[in-house]
Every structure is written in structure tokens, then in C-alpha cells.
Amino acid sequence: MPLQKIVLRPGINREGTNYSNEGGYWACDKVRFRSGYPEKIGGWTLYSASEFWGVARSMLPFQCQCGATLTGLGTNLKFYVEFGAAFYDITPLAETNTLGANPFTGDGTTTVAVTDAGRTVGTGDFVTFSGVTGAYAGVLNGEFKVTYISGSTYSITTSSAVAAGATGGSAVSAAYQVSVGGSIYTQGTGWGAGNWSRGAWGSATSVGVGLQLRLWSLDNYGDALIFGPRGGGLYYWDYNAGAGLSTRGELVADMPGANSVPIYQNEILVSDQSRFVITLGSNDFGSTDANPMLVRWSDQENYLEWEPTALTQAGSQILSIGSQLITARQTRQEIVIWSDAAVFAMQYAGPPYVFGFTTLADNTTIAGPNAAIVVNNVAYWMGTDKFYVYNGKVDVLPSTLRSYVFNDFNTAQAWQVTTGAVNQYNEVWWFYCSANSNTIDRYVVFNYVDNIWFSGSMNRFAWVDSGLKQYPIASVYDEATEKGQIYAQEYGFDDFTTSPATPIAAYIDSSDFDIGEGDNFGLVNRIIPDISFEGSTGTSPTVNMTLYPRRFPGADYSAGDETSVVRSHTVPVEQYTEQVFVRVRGRQMRFRVASSGLGVMWQLGMPRIQMRPDGRK
């Protein structure tokens, strides 16, 4: 009886039917393609055991002149700088007030009321008290999260009970951090609604849906960080200044020498070569109204000077296609800017115009501010119904998973989409919310060298490739505790964030293929596997290989004829189990290779099956 070699095209293709994709793969999870063959992806471990408040959707590693490597980290609740696997809270302050005498009122529990007629806070905001005297100074001096608001009074929860009555003394100072943001988009709210337009954040401006989701943008300015929340101010933090890591970010507009600094911004970046600070969606010079289509830049090498004069290169430009500018990324030659309807190029031209702008394409979309990435000087991004690429010109990026992704995509949470790269494997990853999920739970990957796609399930909210870090890093979030952590990705082959480590389940399914010519039923009685376990750390790594037969493309798979093969590997890596005997009957079949053991790494080659004709019925 002849052997039939199973030779399959790399990548996952869901653009047709299962049967029409004969010779390809249909589905996978935690599997990538390397050199054309599927293999299990790497595992992950804790980059740091420390937690931080909120879900981090923005991360930027950068290196100071002193050699220190830091990471700016923006969450929906705070802003941090990571150094040495420790997270330092540099969240800017919105306001500092001196409270009236005995501003705290206890009721014998850990719920304490605070009176401050000069500040309107929001639920979830953070405040730090100092100067508290009396019996509860050790309890009330410190940082707290606001839990309830009623007029000029709000509540906090303390670590121990405070007796009934007023307390605190007459010299209490309350330092309020900038308002917290949402972890997801909530319908019916946004800029100009609720607490978003209060206090130091300025007047209400309507610049589109989805902006309630807290997204920070950030870029390094030498040893310093320039950063800010979307719709908020422009902040500066310098590692070498003052107390260093314990120094909070400072509002640029309040710094000595600041002139006409934007009140609002929706995106911040620093041009690599020309050293301008650039904002999108800010207020123009002489205006306090945010313009969502405005590009504005500072004077060269001067983040404090924003007034356009004959002596500066500060300036601005309104772009005309779209209703709001979404994001921007730098390539070697230019800055690429996305609106919700077009793509533009921004290039330094020198005085008097400073920057020139070109429309690269219109009638385009982008899922959100974190949906674009530049890899090897090529821009890739996820739109609302397709993928795009810019490599000299804008094109739709053909995808064998386009329908699969966008037919199961929660467009209401599109601004949660985040992207990252794994240059080691030539991959661009997008993480997104499936149709029935309000948080990220899926990923789709494009291999730009092999021009193939694959997908799976994983919840990562920000991703930065290795470079300044040994491994790619990604953020995770526990909604119940409102705490986040950073994982190091592509570490081993298991989940090392638990103790002991837990296995990562992985599988890949082929599409249906005919047994012989497909006219007759075939009886498969032997499988010659071709699986490598090179790199496995387990003592007996195994995979399950399962054949699923069926009679016709529209018929169910015959569960009764299903035969699983468990292949052990206890000999040198390049020596394989010679053969496995089975009995599986059908006109067409698919197979699955899956693993769920600890320390298992595998790569699938070209297995073979032996079959004989077995009638037409």
C-alpha cells in the first residue's frame, strides 16, 4: 500500500471553506511558522514580581547617557518609570490643596470622609495626604484611592479603623494626581462628559468616540521623557534632575521659560533627527480650543518654546482629510501620520516652512492609536476592516485571515488594539478584542518575510520587542485587583509566572485533505510522524496527533473513527518513533497536532500516512 506524504502550505487560511483550502492549515493556537513549518511559540515569565496600578497600554524602553535602561509605562490609573524591575510612580499632580482644620471624619471603620471644598475629584482618583497630626497620623499620611464622592466630601479606605469624629489637624496638604481614565471604552461617555473635563484637564472638547479609554503617548528627549494622556497636557520628566526616580512628571506649560505650550494633545512624539517635539490634536498658538486635525511642533531642540516667530521654527499645520488625527510613527525618511480617513507624510524642510506634508492615501482606516507599527522602515497597521502596509506607497495588506479576524472583532473596543513585533521571527503581532469580549483576548500575526498569517488567543495589552531588553516584554492586567504586571515573552516553553510552572497548551489543525483521489473511502492504517522535539526541557515530551475523518465536506467528523496517537520522545532528538498503527476510515480527513505537557517544544515536518481503498460507501 502506498504512503501519502502530507505536504501543507505554511500559514493559516480562513478565506474559503475548509475543503477548498486542501493542502493548507485551518486553525492554530500558540503556534508559529518558522522556515515554513509550524512549531510551538515560546513561553513567558515575570519580568518583575512587582505589580502596578492599572492596565498598561503604552511602554517605551530608553537608555540614558549614564547607561541606565528605563521604561516609561502609562496605565489607565497612573504613569510609571521602570528601573531595575522596580516601578516608580511619577504620575503628574493636577493640584495641591491645603485643607481646612480636621478635614477627616471617621465612623469607627476603615471608611473615612475627607472634606475639600476646593477640589472636585472623581471616583478612582488618587490623592496623597501629608501634614496629618494626631492619633491617626500614621494611618492618614500617605496615598489613597477615592471611593465615593458627595459634594465637597469624598471617601477613602484606610488600612485600619478611624474612630468617630473629626481629626487630622490644621496643616493637612492634599496632592491630587491627574484624573484616572477608563480601562475600556464605555458607550455614551467621552471627552466633555462626566469628570473628564474638570480641573486641570481644561475645557470640554469633542474629538471623537473611544477617547474615554486612557491612552498615554510618550517619547524620550535625551535622558528625559515627554509624555501625556490623550486629551490631556504635556508633561516632562528628567531622570537626572533632582531626586531622579522619585520625581513626578511636571506640566511643561508650568515650567520656567515655557511659552505657548499646548494645553491639550492627543499624541506626542520627538522627531529623531531634527529634535522637534510634535503633538497631534492640540490647541493652536493663541487659541484654547483643541483642533483634532492639527499638527503642532515646538522650536528645534527646545521643548519649552512653541510660539512661531521669525526667531523660532515652532509652527503648526491643519490637515484636511478626516475628522481627527489618530497617531503617528517615525520611519527613516519621514513621520507617518494617520487620521481616521487618510495617511500623511511629514518631512522636515527647514525654514521658513519647517515641515512639509503629503497625502499618501485617503479612504483608509486605522483601528486605534496603538494599531500601527514600523518594522524595518515599513509601516503596518490594522484598520477597522482590513490590514494595510506602507513601503513607499500605501496598499491593502492581503490577509488569509481577514474575514476570520474582522467578522469576530469588537469594533466598539477597537481603540484597545495594540501591536508589537518579534523581529527574531520576522513577525508583527496585533492583539484585539473578539466580538463577545470587552477586553483583549485574541491575536493575529503577520510574518513579513514568508508573507503568511496565523492567529490564536492571548491577552496582552502592550508589547515591546527585545532590543534594550533581553526578551520582548508585554503587559498583563487583572481586572479584579486593578493591578498589572510585565511579562518577559519568548522565555522557555511554559508559563513561568506561576510556581511551579504550568504548561502552555498549543495545537494546529490542517484543512481537510482527500484520501487518495477522494472517489473512494480510504482506510488509514499507519502513520509515520515527522515531529522534532529539539529544545524540549521535559523528560518525556509528547504531542497528540489526531486524525478526524468524514464522508463529505458538509458532514460531521466521525468521532467514532477518531484515533489519537501519543508519540513519546525518550531518544536523541533526531531519532523519531518509526511508525504508529491506526484504523481510520473516510473520504477526507484533517489532522491535529497538540501538546499540553510541561517543557514541551515541538516542530511539525511532513508526516506520512499509509492507506488503501475501502469502497465507495
Question: Language-model segments: which ranges?
Answer:
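Short linear, low-complexity motifs centered on an aromatic residue
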Residues: 234-254, 540-552
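Small/polar beta-strand repeat architecture
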Residues: 1, 9, 15-16, 89-214, ...
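Beta-propeller and closely related beta-pinwheel folds
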Residues: 43-66, 91-94, 197-211, 244-417
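Hydrophobic or amphipathic alpha-helical targeting/insertion segments
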Residues: 89, 223-237, 244
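Predominantly extracellular/luminal cell-surface or secreted proteins
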Residues: 82-84, 128-132, 157-159, 237, ...
